[in-house]
Amino acid sequence: MSILEQIQGGADLRRFSLRELEQLCQEIRWEILRVVARNGGHLSSNLGAVELTVALHYVYDLPRDKLLFDVGHQCYAHKLLTGRLHEFPTLRRAGGLSGFPRRQESESDAFGAGHSGTAVSAALGFARAARLLGEDYHCVALVGDGAFMDGPNVEALNDAGRSELPLVVVLNDNTMSISKNVGALSEYLNRLRSNRGYWRFKSRTAGFLKRIPGVGPALHDAVYSVKNAVKSLLVHGQFFENLGFTYLGPIDGHNLSLLIRNLTRAKNLGRPVLVHAVTQKGYGYKPAEEKPDKYHGVAPYFVEREAAPAPGFDACAGQTLLEMAAEDPAVCVITAAMRDGTGVARFAEAHPDRFFDVGIAEEHAVTLAAGLAAGGAKPFFAVYSTFLQRGYDQIVHDVALQNLHAVFLIGHAGLVGEDGATHQGAFDLSFLTHVPNLTLLAPSCAQELAMMLRWAKDAPGPVAIRYPKAESAAAHNIVPLQKGDWQVVSVAHRAQAVVFAVGSMVGPAMMAADTLALEGLEVEVVNCRKVKPLPDRMLEKYARLPIVTLEENAVLGGFGAQVAVRCAQLGLGARVLPLGIPDAFIPHGTRAQQLAGCGLDVEGICRTLRRLLGADNPKDALEVGRD
């Protein structure tokens, strides 16, 4: 039996020797590699955090003590150490383990995560709750150096440092978030981790003191307690101490002995402590060590594809931006630590002077875009839908209120598959359609996206373009945007209903119309590529027919709701049936499974239209079609 198979929690860890714990770390790595190879997932970050996670579980008593992950990209070892080994092969699969911490999954998952900037605030909340309720437990926030730059984490550090509560923040410093870290805080950490003079001084002094007969260990501890005074002479700036934290580090994040010793000391201090551990992303797996960014989030890589994938929306956006930049020197691009994921890495290489990676700081990114626009530039902010939520106030107050020409490229809109509930792009249509001055577009294919980008470059006011994580659908005969807000893409000569489809739903709607046509039901499909403002002329044209709206967005407050409201305002008396994502957080699974579960796959759309037209099955549909 392996050591890992004997572990159900921290108490089990404490039965093993240091050498056995090091063996356990290797077993954990191989299990992570085995499962991620088949299921996909976050590989590099998890491989780099194994020793750190084992040490945390060794020192702290979970679930009584609270361990909180920021983002949660590093939680796989934690799951394996808390009784989920036999479920681990279900990672990121429908009905299986989530790829992120999830309170509903285990009592050892103290707080759910998926976005950055949450762990320190929530851990401080736990610590204050413990004091209020007279409970006695320890709180630890594990934060990566990329997420550490996020504004809410800095705000929480500022609050926590003066609290005098027993809160430990562990900085997992692997020198890399999804994209290269940027900014002054990142440079500060670089100085801390690379100050060889401090490391040499500390090592030599400790060795000398411990060798003094009789009093060596005690003298070492006494000197160690005043090390901050020495450190301040050798390391420029005392950012964490100035915030009120006791700073321990930097320490080797792959040395179990050092980790256990420092975490134990932090635990016993009983006040705010920051433990700075330097780790290597992908540690223990050479390909991931050499290219950690490529192994950050990976698809299953033991699966053979039958054909090459179609061009993606992100790649199309990046290529079109490159072409526009060659034509217009005012074009510039902003991203929030996601240059690869949003498809703009090539733009960054070609135009470093016109590319701004602000780190994990979406709020700042939006207002930066506003300032660039006010100054005469043409900014494009490439961001995932789920992360744009963080900049909502800035969209309203800084961009739309001033009617500034900033363009938001909203990728991963709709259902995103295995990353699950925390990463679904289910709300952008709802929170953007009611913002005045803003034009909202949704392409049905990559070619339409390219056309929209070129149109948006010189359009008045703010523009948002949302597109899915999915591969691009095949192009249809696209009419230029200037010649029509909406485009009829599937014509029915004696239409019995019309489908207003948005973006990624256009392809499935057309396939559903083809299927129903074989059953004698005639349904017209409209590509509603301009979601806001709505074209009254098209609403008036189709008001006599039953209208089904299709969107990969929350049905509450989404496109369908806007269509129903506008039809009512125009007094059209239209019958509108909105279809979209239900009022629920959609769990992880494949994108196809999620679409089917929401009734947004071809069969689900056909089923809804048959029911609407009084034909509950294909046989009934043939009878209705003859009427």
Model-derived regions, located:
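Long, well-ordered, tryptophan-enriched scaffold segments
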Residues: T175-A317
